[in-house]
C-alpha cells in the first residue's frame, strides 16, 4: 500500500506520502548524444540531498526526476501534483544545469507519484507468525529493485527457510511512527527547505556543510 497506507485504520503515521516527479525530453539527435554520452543507457545521479536521478531511454530521450513537491498537511495526496506543478519546472531547471546540451530540447512528458516514506527512511520486511500476516514496504523510491528482494525474502520467511535473505537487517525492522500534526508538516517542510539550503551552500563552497549532520539527525 506504500503511500496509501495512511488510509488503513491506525496507520496514518506509519508512512508519509512524499512526491517524486519526473520529466522526459523529446528524442535527442545523435549530435546531442555525442556531447552527452550515456551510450550504455547508464543511470545517473549525484550526492545532493534533494535527490535527482536520470536515464537515457530506449527511444533516445532523457528521463529525469527528483523530489521537491511540498508535503501536504495531514498526509494529503493531490493527484494534480503528479502532472502539473512548479516542482516540475525546478526539475527541468536542474536538468538544464546538469546537462546544458538539453536546454533546447522540448519537454514532452511530466508525471509523478507518491512514495511511502518511513520515519527513519528505512524499508522493512517481516512476518508475524502468530497471525500469518507479512509485510514489506517503505521503499522511498527504490521499490523496483527492493520489492523484488522483499518478495524473495518474504517467501523464505513464510516457508521458514533459513537463508542469507532472512538475516538481512531490514527483516523484522520497525520504524518509529511519524510525529502527529502539525509537527509532521512543520518538520518535513522545514527539512526540505534546509536540504535545499545545504545543497546551495555546498555547491557554492565545494565542501560539506556543517548543518549536514544536523539534517541527518533530524531525518533519522
Q: What feature does the model see in each segment?
A:
Residues 129-134, 140-220:
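C-terminal lid/capping helical subdomain adjacent to the catalytic/cofactor pocket in oxidative enzymes
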Residues 1-4, 151:
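Short hydrophobic core segments
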Amino acid at each position: 500500500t506504500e503511500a496509501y497506507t495512511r488510509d488503513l485504520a491506525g496507520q496514518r503515521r506509519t508512512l508519509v506520502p512524499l512526491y517524486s516527479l519526473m520529466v522526459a525530453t523529446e528524442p535527442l539527435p545523435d549530435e546531442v548524444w555525442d556531447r552527452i554520452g550515456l551510450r550504455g543507457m547508464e543511470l545517473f545521479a549525484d550526492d545532493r540531498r534533494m535527490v535527482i536521478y536520470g536515464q537515457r531511454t530506449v527511444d533516445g530521450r532523457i528521463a529525469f526526476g527528483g523530489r521537491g513537491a511540498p508535503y501536504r498537511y495531514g498526509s494529503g495526496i493531490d493527484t494534480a501534483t503528479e502532472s502539473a506543478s512548479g516542482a516540475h519546472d525546478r526539475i527541468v531547471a536542474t536538468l538544464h544545469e546538469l546537462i546544458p546540451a538539453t536546454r533546447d530540447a522540448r519537454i514532452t512528458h511530466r508525471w509523478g507519484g507518491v512514495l511511502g516514506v518511513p520515519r527513519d527512511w528505512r524499508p522493512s520486511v517481516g512476518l508475524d507468525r502468530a497471525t500469518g500476516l507479512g509485510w514489506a514496504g517503505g521503499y522511498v523510491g527504490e521499490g523496483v529493485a527492493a520489492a523484488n528482494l522483499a518478495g524473495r525474502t518474504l517467501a523464505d520467511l513464510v516457508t521458514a527457510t533459513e537463508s542469507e535473505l532472512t538475516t538481512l537487517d531490514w527483516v523484522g525492522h520497525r520504524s518509529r511512527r511519524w510525529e502527529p500534526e502539525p509537527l509532521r508538516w512543520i518538520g518535513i517542510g522545514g527539512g526540505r527547505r534546509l536540504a535545499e539550503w545545504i545543497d546551495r551552500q555546498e555547491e557554492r563552497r565545494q565542501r560539506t556543510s556543517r548543518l549536514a549532520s544536523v539534517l541527518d539527525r533530524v531525518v533519522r
